[in-house]
UniProtKB/Swiss-Prot annotation:
The protein's name: DNA polymerase delta subunit 2
Organism of derivation: Bos taurus
PTM (free text): The N-terminus is blocked most probably through acetylation, as has been shown for the human ortholog.
Modified residues (N-acetylmethionine): 1
GO cellular component: delta DNA polymerase complex
Gene3D superfamilies per UniProt: 2.40.50.430, 3.60.21.50
UniProt record, GO biological process: DNA biosynthetic process; DNA repair; DNA strand elongation involved in DNA replication
Main location: nucleus
UniProt xrefs under PANTHER family: DNA POLYMERASE DELTA SUBUNIT 2 (PTHR10416:SF0)
Subcellular location: Nucleus
Role noted for this protein: Accessory component of both the DNA polymerase delta complex and the DNA polymerase zeta complex. As a component of the trimeric and tetrameric DNA polymerase delta complexes (Pol-delta3 and Pol-delta4, respectively), plays a role in high fidelity genome replication, including in lagging strand synthesis, and repair. Pol-delta3 and Pol-delta4 are characterized by the absence or the presence of POLD4. They exhibit differences in catalytic activity. Most notably, Pol-delta3 shows higher proofreading activity than Pol-delta4.
């Protein structure tokens, strides 16, 4: 792939100076469409209740679930609402899951004066053997029992269950199904290799020198300032860069300053100011050479709730001079040369990880495709805007590349759907800790990591810059 294109390294590096320097034109993106309009907030009203988003989610998802249930259990299966259930009658019910979890953090429990409890310590996972699943529709709710994996499922998932209601007021599940992968438009065939670089978690302002070195080396590789002619030719095939959130370090939050007296902080400067200036300079170097899409993340200066709105251009006075810089939403979706990308900065996957038994980030990505929802745990355990007309997190169509940022390690996987869908799943690692980014080949949908964490003799077979698969 990318590393294989860097040819004749030793010859060009050790050759005498030449009067003519080779130049390589950037391989351009022929067609590009930003499809993130559903995630842009116009009117911002937080006076509405969150019940509306669950109601509209169920209304939008019900036709998909009914169709899927009839495919799985036969066209003659009875599909009923909870208020129509009869004890002992086998039928199918479509509803939204609520997962009752005794370990789930609760602000009401923490501030309770009656119990005088200590604050619950943070945990990596909040699942417990006593967790229960409750299915809700527009009118009623019922507890689920039987053949269903309680630990894996999360609140907000819309699914269809097959079984019967018992005399004890519980629903005995025999089988269940999700909406499945959405329909997918075929990708346009490409005759040449061109790459999209995925990077997340630059973590600027964290104080790590190695992270800054790796970031600058990454910029130099993409802009063609590093390596021999073969590597510069390879870098010219990077047609676009997507920065998937957490551009600033969590150390820049400076939340302790809120509790300090004003006279102690009058002449101090927020830790994020210098980090934003540094980010502006990095974006300036990148956008002068290649189109760049910048997604916000958990620690970046924008709204906390999903969908996160684009970073304000006034923070980047240098980089915004270039039209190649595009400040986008989180989640972000776009079509690049006929290949549909959809990705997040990782909050949705991290939240599902905490409240589910699923351990692998790629498994969670695939599971969200199966349930046809980007972030089912929002707004229960993950903040989101109180939508009421439509739920923008439902997959309208299946992407070709589906990624999440800020994962502990790199991972990629191609899955096939029942209707010939082909999806590349990518876990983009946190760059500040792994010094690793990802290259996606638009022609073949192959993915490889590109690492800047080590330099030495052991990297000779990977090109000295970690440009290996």
């Amino acid at each position: 792939m990318f590393s294989e294109q860097a040819a004749q390294r030793a010859h060009t590096l050790l050759s005498p100076p030449s009067a003519s320097n080779a130049t390589f034109a950037r391989v351009p993106v022929v067609t590009y469409t930003n499809s993130s309009q559903p995630f842009r907030l116009g009117e911002r009203s937080f006076s509405r209740q969150y019940a509306h988003i669950y109601a509209t989610r169920l209304i939008q998802m019900r036709p998909f679930l009914v169709s899927r249930a009839q495919q799985r259990w036969g066209s003659g299966v009875l599909v009923k609402k909870l208020c129509e259930l009869q004890p002992g009658e086998k039928c199918c019910v479509v509803g939204t899951l609520f997962k009752a979890m005794p370990l789930q953090p609760s602000i009401l429990r923490e501030v309770s004066e009656e119990h005088n409890l200590l604050p619950q310590p943070p945990r990596s996972k909040y699942i417990h053997p006593d967790d229960e699943l409750i299915l809700e529709d527009e009118l009623q709710r019922i507890k689920l029992e039987g053949t269903i994996d309680v630990s894996k499922l999360v609140t907000g998932t819309v699914l269809a269950v097959l079984g019967s209601a018992g005399d004890d007021g519980k629903f005995l599940v025999e089988d269940h199904c999700f909406a499945g992968l959405a329909p997918q438009k075929p990708a346009c065939p490409l005759d040449t290799d061109r790459f999209v670089l995925l990077v997340s978690g630059l973590g600027l302002g964290g104080g790590g020198g190695e992270s800054l070195l790796g970031t600058q080396l990454l910029v130099d590789v993409v802009t063609g300032q590093l390596g021999d002619e073969g590597e510069q030719c390879s870098a010219a095939h990077v047609s676009r860069v997507i920065l998937a959130g957490n551009l600033l370090s969590h150390n820049t939050q400076s939340r302790d300053s809120i509790n300090k007296a004003k006279y102690l902080t009058k002449k101090t400067q927020a830790a994020s100011v210098e980090a934003v200036k540094m980010l502006d300079e990095i974006l300036l170097q990148l956008s002068a050479s290649v189109p760049v899409d910048v997604m916000p993340g958990e620690f970046d200066p924008t709204n906390y709730t999903l969908p996160q709105q684009p970073l304000h251009p006034c923070m980047f006075p240098l980089a915004t001079a270039y039209s190649t810089l595009q400040l986008v939403t989180n989640p972000y979706q776009a079509t690049i040369d006929g290949v549909r990308f959809l990705g997040t900065s990782g909050q949705n996957v991290s939240d599902i990880f905490r409240y589910s038994s699923m351990e692998d980030h790629l498994e969670i990505l695939e599971w969200t495709l199966q349930v046809r929802h980007i972030s089912p745990t929002a707004p229960d355990t993950l903040g989101c805007y109180p939508f009421y007309k439509t739920d923008p997190f439902i997959f309208p169509e299946c992407p070709h590349v589906y990624f999440c940022g800020n994962t502990p390690s790199f991972g990629s996987k191609i899955i096939q759907g029942p209707e010939d869908q082909t999806v590349l799943l990518v876990a983009v690692p946190d760059f500040s800790t792994t010094q690793t980014a990802c290259l996606v080949n638009l022609r073949s949908l192959a993915c490889q990591p590109i690492s800047f964490s080590g330099f030495g003799a052991e990297d000779e077979d990977l090109g000295g810059l970690g440009l290996g698969p």
